[in-house]
Design a protein with these regions (language model features):
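Solvent-exposed loop and edge beta-strand segments that line ligand/cofactor-binding
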Residues: 257, 289-304, 347-396, 411, ...
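Well-ordered alpha-helical scaffold segments within catalytic/enzyme domains
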Residues: 251-258, 304-322, 396-410, 452-465, ...
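CBM-like carbohydrate-recognition segments
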Residues: 298, 368, 528-642
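Extended, well-ordered alpha-helical scaffold segments
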Residues: 257-272, 320-340, 390, 409-425, ...
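Solenoidal tandem-repeat scaffolds enriched in leucines and small polar residues
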Residues: 421, 425, 430-451, 455-464, ...
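Low-complexity, Ser/Thr/Pro/Gly-enriched N-terminal "stalk/linker" regions
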Residues: 246-301, 329-332, 336, 340-354, ...
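Basic nucleic-acid-binding interfaces
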Residues: 41-244
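N-terminal export signals
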Residues: 2, 8-31
Length: 642
């Protein structure tokens, strides 16, 4: 009988999402397996080897297992002893599993996590429930007052395989968030469930290996020794609370688009509104596992970008755009940003106190993010010193946000002042300065500030401003040369947005050709196939896991697709359609709704949030911003995707 490959197991649902953090959907994999694997199933799962055409447990058995665990916890607090629960355990009638773990969480915080042996699965479950409830490692044993609000996860190990010595040193040997890890050195052993990569600071293979060695009482480099056994493990997780309880039903498998556009736009826009402070600004960096906001200074570029996304939403035909509360809160955000501006002697207005930190596309050092040293694994950003000259980026995005609709009506004078500053930032050669008051450009900032400044002019040109259009024309050749000399992903996101608009407005093929040149170059970094199917559709230059910057790159691809459709470029249209479909599947996995709700400290606060990566589930405000504008762009071409 043919066995099910690791790839088949993943494609069947174990890695079908960042819910892939938990292989919950393994339960339905028998219906999804490739034809080559359909006749049989061979999993290293204790006494139920080679189950033919069926998942490890039936739907009825799953329900009985989780019910037994929940009932055991209630009865133990009611004064029952484990011996009193044995008849219930035996009644389950399922043979012992290779390993059972019970994890208890309260408000997303782990309160206990233990395993226990047993003569059958029922005994393993009740014994593990007792041990988890008495676990002293996470704030002491579970107390009665918190029991009613405690979620429970039943983890069942359904497979394992040895990681050969040489393979341990390969890149991405583990499917992080999908597979667990086990180590054994002559009886000194320990294991991690798949969720550890999501909830801990150990977000790479190496850091997991080292931490697990320490847990087993071994030297942190013991995993490198050939006589030490290291195994990857596959698990099934049965949670007591489903995501649907907080986030509503999951997207139907037969849905025409991988992302529900209407609800995604509304929920992500409300995420920014819901997490505003009294000044109108939105939370910069949020950790949904700990339910805490990271205490960092805000970034003016990213704050203005969030307002731009909300402004674009207000100009759309979505129901949310007609909501009075949404209008008021968006205007409040605008006032907060304007309070951080100052007037110039030339009658302009600029945003002050801006950090020259990078935009999402600049942060893509694929392996650096999860491996960053330090307790909080903070994102690397350049801190702006006191008195540093104001950058063009935040001023440009604030101007773009105020350039139309109700915001332009309410802040007409402020917009004109901001616009004057942007027009004054263009140099005689057509390029833009990167910091007001300084003619020498910052090489890094030029890649994205120039596109943001040009976006303001492109939006004006679309409204019939011929002077703005002429300024775009003057900038065209210098920035074409800039890209050809040193192409970078940081440049493409904003410049494709700009020049696709100008190409459609003017019908000039030179602009269209430049858009297609950038997009074709960018798409070489899109992952077309990978053994970790979650990666497919994302973008990565170094071969590491794709990150949140994929959202920016996909929006550029969507805008290039719209241009290809308008210009009748059938070949590119077909290619871009396929790339956009694939990219949307990846971007969907970054939504916090794809994270098991039992891991989230406050699920309702998370609604609409978009994570930094498949494993790093923190939310930064500008990632939400780019997700909103991506969805708005997709709406323009969605009929070509279905």
């Amino acid at each position: 009988m043919p066995s099910v490959s690791r790839r088949d197991l993943i494609s069947a649902g174990v890695a079908v999402g960042a819910t892939a953090c938990f292989p919950r959907q393994l339960l339905s994999f028998a219906r999804s397996l490739p034809e080559s694997a359909a006749p049989s199933l061979a999993l290293s799962a204790g006494s139920w080897m080679q189950q033919v055409g069926k998942p490890p447990y039936s739907a009825g058995e799953e329900g009985a297992i989780i019910n037994l665990a929940q009932s055991a916890l209630v009865k133990l607090f009611d004064g029952k002893m484990l011996s009193d629960l044995q008849s219930d355990a035996d009644h389950l009638g399922i043979p012992a599993a290779e390993r059972v773990n019970i994890t208890l969480r309260h408000a997303g915080r782990i309160r206990g996590s233990m395993s226990a042996p047993g003569k059958n699965l029922g005994t393993q479950v009740i014994e593990s429930v007792f041990r988890a409830a008495m676990d002293r490692r996470y704030g002491g044993p579970l107390a009665r007052w918190e029991a009613s609000g405690t979620s429970l996860e039943v983890w069942l190990q359904v497979g394992s395989s040895e990681i050969d010595h040489d393979a341990r040193f390969e890149k991405s040997v583990l499917l992080l968030g999908v597979e667990g890890l086990e180590i054994d050195d002559h009886g000194q052993s320990a294991y991690y469930k798949p969720s550890v990569a999501i909830t801990s600071r150990y977000k790479t293979d190496v850091t997991l290996f080292e931490a697990l060695c320490k847990k087993a009482g071994l030297d942190k480099d013991a995993w490198k020794q050939p006589d030490v056994n290291v195994r990857r493990t596959q698990w099934l997780c049965l949670p007591s609370v489903s995501n649907a309880h907080f986030f509503g039903p999951q997207l139907s498998p037969v849905a025409k688009l991988p992302i529900p556009l209407d609800s995604s736009i509304a929920e992500s826009a409300y995420y920014l509104i819901r997490n505003q402070n009294v000044s109108g600004g939105t939370a910069y960096l949020y950790d949904p596992i700990a339910d805490s906001f990271v205490g960092k200074k805000t970034n003016s570029v990213r704050a203005a970008g969030c307002l731009f996304a909300l402004s674009q939403t207000l100009q759309s035909n979505h129901d949310i755009a007609d909501t009075e509360t949404f209008k008021i809160r968006t205007a409040q955000m605008a006032r907060g940003l304007l309070s951080r501006t100052s007037l110039t002697g030339e009658g302009g207005r600029v945003v002050q106190g801006e950090k020259t930190g990078t935009l999402p596309e600049e942060d893509e050092r694929d392996d650096e993010l999860p491996e960053r040293a330090g307790k909080d694994a903070e994102l690397a950003e350049e801190e702006e010193s006191d008195g540093e000259l104001a950058g063009v980026g935040a001023t440009a995005l604030l101007a773009a946000a105020l350039s139309a609709g109700i915001l332009r009506k309410e802040f007409a004078q402020e917009y004109q002042q901001l616009y004057r500053s942007i027009t004054s930032a263009q140099k005689p050669d057509g390029r833009f300065i990167t910091h007001f008051g300084e003619t020498e450009e910052s090489e890094r900032a030029a890649n994205y500030y120039s596109g943001q400044a040009l976006l303001v002019l492109a939006l004006e040109a679309e409204r019939g401003n011929t002077k703005a259009l002429e300024m775009c024309r003057r900038a065209f050749e210098p920035y074409v040369f800039h890209f050809k000399q040193a192409p970078t992903t940081a440049f493409v996101g904003w410049h494709v947005n700009v020049w696709s608009r100008i190409a459609i407005l003017t019908g000039n093929h030179a602009y269209a050709d430049f858009v297609f040149e950038q997009t074709d170059w960018l798409l070489q970094w899109q992952i077309k196939s990978h053994r970790d199917l979650r990666w497919v559709g994302g973008f990565s230059q170094s071969g590491g896991a794709p990150q949140f910057s994929s959202i920016v790159f996909l929006e550029a691809t969507v805008r290039a697709l719209l241009l290809a459709i308008r210009t009748g470029d059938a070949k590119r249209t077909k290619n871009y359609v396929d790339c956009v479909r694939s990219g949307l599947h990846f971007c969907r996995l970054l939504r916090l709704e794809e994270t098991p709700s039992t891991l989230l400290g406050n699920p309702m606060r998370c609604k609409g949030g978009v994570a930094l990566g498949l494993i790093d589930r923190r939310v930064r405000c500008d990632v939400v911003q780019h997700f909103i504008t991506l969805c708005l762009a997709v709406e323009e071409i969605k009929k070509h995707l279905v």
